[in-house]
Amino acid sequence: MTFQFGHLQFCIENEHILLTGAQGFPLVGQSPFCEIQIAGEIKDSHLGIKMINSSEGRKLRYVSHLLEQNTLQIVQESDLVRATTTFTMHEDGNGVQISTRVTNIFAEPLVLEEVSAFVLSGFAPVSMAGQFQLTRFTQSHHTECQPLTDSLSELGLLDTCDRRQARVAFGNVGSWSTKEALPQGILCNADSQDSLLFQIESSNSWYYEIATANGAFYLYLGGANASHGAWSKRLCCGESYDTVSVSLAFGHGLNDLLANATRHRRHIAGKCAPDAELPSIFNEYMHLSWDSPSADATRIYAPVVSRLGVKYYVIDCGWHNEEDGNVIYPYVGHWRESQKRFPLGVRETTDYIRSLGMKAGLWIEPEIIGCKCAEMLEFYDDDCFLSRHGKRICTMNRYFLDYRHPRVIEYMTEAIRRMVEDYGADYIKMDFNQDCGIGTDRDALTPGEGLESHARAYLAWIDAMRACFPQVLFETCSSGGMRMDYATLSHFSIVSTSDQTSYLRYPYIAGNVLAAALPEQAAVWSYPVGTDTPGFTPTPEWVNANISDEQIIMNMINSYLGRIHLASHLELLSEHKLELIAQGIRYYDSMIPFKKQAVPYMPLGLCRFGNALVADRKSVV
């Protein structure tokens, strides 16, 4: 028996179900699309730590499938587990979201060591290693979304023998999901241009591999596992585990592929009413207040910003502590207003911002506590923190809160309520500036399981805050783009793409970012008076002599592909230069209806740092 779900073809025979085709990819081989390794069970392989030939993969027998308009659910069973894989598609594209639930149907407890969300088996014969290319995206501070393209043969997957240990494997370990790479990639047949984009929707550890089996290539997608991320999961009889979700999109060439991926992401992205019209945002942080805002400074900056047509004015880190900005971080965590910086209270300043016709925003780092924040260290019990071997994890003078603990939920919920109802926040920027590493072994079989459970609890809390305060716009940031994954982006409507401080370098990020995030989600800094040049002097004379019209215009253009985060010493600019920014805001506003439906078009393809051109106006059709 064969049947089709969207662009996927399945075949049921001999008590097994196989995926036999996907758009542009006539699959070869006879391998399962679900792999599950149980501790103590035989892994039918001598191939090192490759994820195929798991103890349960080929033992899974077809039980049933339920095909509805947008959803396909396939149930398979071995003697030990039931695997329920769910595929979800939408009518306006070919993207598909996939996840698997594993249930222990054995009489005794089992320990899962590896569970795929999905395996695309046989996407090309090994003989095509030279013409199939993988594009992955490296990440780092100030250099997000950088593509690297290699053929599978260049990556070492050669057509030599069928029992090879070689694999191409990429992943993340820790709470910054995208600190080294995006959890996505593009597979392309260079001859036909048939292409596939895959993404793993995990806000913490994740893993994928490409290797060979039975004379063909496979793509394994999932979260952490025992070998990568120190993850295992104990299931008692009747208990279940849900994998991360993954998504696939198909296309012919880069632009068609990204268009289909963009349409799919619009169905899974976070949305909220106050962000529906993609309002422009000014944030004091970049090239301005940094981590030392004050009521007096805001009264200087805000009147100028309000004249430009900006909708939100955000006060970033520093509104909440008495310590100086350069030493503030070891002391953060109570999230109460600074009497030194805001002697009349933060509410007096946010009310002033609203009196100018803008909405007000505040910053918070809700997942950490400074290691010198005595008040909160006394309030929280030891089991409120992520820990290993009974010791709290500490990075850069910060401890990490565990959102599985009700005391953490209670205090942080009150902190958000205080920011909204007492301090007048219409916008909350939620930052996360450190990585906790492999995870926590408190109340978990392994650190990877503890990290995953905490991360899911944190996102559930985010959903609760959005439900409690639907009038508030919540932004996610992680030292720029260090957590730019679609587990996170399915809970937030806007994400910071980078902390890049140079407007001359930002185009290399902005030029690629729509391959990773929606244009209506991807926030890009625009700092017309931003400069890393030594000798910067914050006076009108210096600024107007040294900040050119071209610099202002380029800063505005940098942000047009995504969401504008305006910043810097605008109050020092001449009326002529301010009018250039106002024109830029008006043009940004004019693009909003189009942007909400637009798909990427990359006339020169993906770009790299140092390219002479990111895009060419003459190439646009």
Regions flagged by a language model, labelled:
Residues A567-S619:
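Glycan-recognition and catalytic regions of carbohydrate-active enzymes
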